[in-house]
Each structure stands twice: as structure tokens, then as C-alpha cells.
A protein has these predicted regions:
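A short, basic/aromatic helix-end/turn motif that makes direct DNA contacts
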Residues: 42-48, 157, 167
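Basic, Lys/Arg- and aromatic-enriched nucleic-acid-binding interface segment
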Residues: 1-43, 51-53, 80-82, 101
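Active-site proximal loops enriched in glycine and acidic residues that flank catalytic Cys/His/Asp
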Residues: 31, 37, 44-45, 59-61, ...
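Short, basic (Lys/Arg/His-rich) helix/loop patches that form interaction surfaces
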Residues: 12-23, 33, 85, 100-107, ...
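Detector for glycine-centered tight turns/loop "hinges" at secondary-structure junctions
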Residues: 53, 68-69, 113
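Conserved long hydrophobic alpha-helices within structured protein cores
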Residues: 48-64, 123-132
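Extended, highly charged linker/hinge segments and catalytic-adjacent loops that couple domains
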Residues: 58-82, 88, 95-96
């Protein structure tokens, strides 16, 4: 299936549904920074600079799991993977609020303050998926005939709404 970015309306509906719930910060970061999920789940507050004139976050770590246990890699595969990403106003605001409440080193944490396990991530993801748009079927002209394609809206694709914020 093809990956398709969420439309503005879908993104807005999703954010409304999950505001104040655990997936909210994850989704906000995904929508406004284009970080990969492995990067979001490894993000720690020491890499989020909210007091700077232009707030930004720094990508330095990646999350993966072994036997369902989270493993945080401090060495990214390539130097190019390390980057600083400026935060739009609404995301900086969202992260400030999250940080005030947070008792963890991790921006997206489980109840114990640790990084998510694979099962916890799947649960988070399911939660998001069930509240996002339904898959759409489109007809595509391939080799002289129409074929049906199901499009599942995906987070983390380059969303058109990156430039402006939804509130």
C-alpha cells in the first residue's frame, strides 16, 4: 500500500481526539518535525531546548527493541542522522506543557518513566490508528486497467500542515 500523509482535517481530528492523552506528544512531534518513530521514542529532555530564542530539538539517539525490551542507541548510524530541528510555536508550547508534568528523562515515557517497550509502542500506535481516518480505496490506472489501492493514512509522512499549527 502507498503511504499518504494525513490531511489537515485528519490531523486536526486526531489531535482533538487525543489531546491530553499519552499519544498526544508523540503525534505532535511526528506531525511537526518529521522525526522517525525510533527517534521520537528515544528523545530525552536533555535534547529539547525550549528556552532558546528559537526552540529546537536535537536528534542524537534512536530507540529499538530486543525481545520487547527497549534499547536506546546513543550512537546514530550516520552523522547525517544527527540533526537539530527548529520547533514551530505550537510544538514548543506542547512540549513545555509536557515537560512541566513529566517525571521522566524521556519525552514519550511509559508509566515507570522509561522508554516504551515494543508492546507499549504497538498499543500507542493502535490507539492512534483507530482514531485516525479510515483507509481509503482509490482507483489507479496501471498497465491499461484500473486497480484498487487501499491508502492508509500514515503519521510521520511529510504532512502538508507542517508550516502552520493546528490549535
Amino acid at each position: 500500500g502507498e503511504k499518504q500523509a494525513l490531511t489537515d482535517e485528519q490531523a486536526e481530528r486526531l489531535l482533538d481526539t487525543i489531546r491530553g492523552l499519552p499519544p498526544y506528544v508523540f503525534v505532535m512531534i511526528g506531525l511537526y518535525t518529521e522525526l522517525r518513530r525510533e527517534e521520537i521514542l528515544a528523545l530525552q529532555w536533555d535534547s529539547v531546548y525550549l528556552e532558546d530564542e528559537v526552540p529546537y530539538l536535537s536528534v542524537r539517539r534512536a530507540w529499538h527493541t530486543e525481545h520487547n525490551r527497549p534499547v536506546i542507541l546513543n550512537e546514530l548510524k550516520t552523522k547525517a542522522a544527527e540533526r537539530n530541528i527548529p520547533l514551530p510555536v505550537c510544538l514548543a508550547k506542547c512540549l513545555r506543557e509536557a515537560k512541566e508534568k513529566s517525571t521522566s528523562d524521556y519525552v514519550v515515557a511509559n508509566r515507570d518513566g522509561g522508554p516504551l517497550s515494543y508492546t507499549q509502542f504497538k498499543r500507542l500506535w493502535q490507539y492512534i490508528v483507530t482514531r485516525t481516518a479510515k483507509p481509503r480505496v482509490i482507483r489507479k490506472y496501471v498497465d491499461g486497467k484500473y486497480e484498487k489501492h487501499t491508502i492508509y493514512p500514515q503519521l510521520g509522512e511529510k504532512a502538508r500542515n507542517n508550516g502552520h499549527c493546528i490549535y
